[in-house]
């Protein structure tokens, strides 16, 4: 499965959530609402989830192994950094 598109849909400087991303695989399947979060150890991605109880969330879609998680995280964080640069240039 190949990542064919990564789109930053919402970018913000406020709070821990930095952006929301959609990622397309093989030009056939898209996963929306992947979040980039600023944590204690730096940026990480949070997969789309739904609330399943008081304060509990469950991923709707997620990678099955660490290798795919790393591929996703690398692609999403690269798109985030590129969007951030474009946003800063546009603000000047």
Swiss-Prot record:
GO biological process, any: division septum assembly
Top-rank taxon, per record: Bacteria
UniProt keyword annotations, A-Z: Cell cycle, Cell division, Septation
Signal peptide: none
Pfam families from the UniProt entry: SpoVG
Function: Could be involved in septation.
HAMAP family reported for this sequence: SpoVG
Family the entry assigns: Belongs to the SpoVG family.
Protein name: Putative septation protein SpoVG
Organism expressing this protein natively: Clostridioides difficile (strain 630)
Gene: spoVG
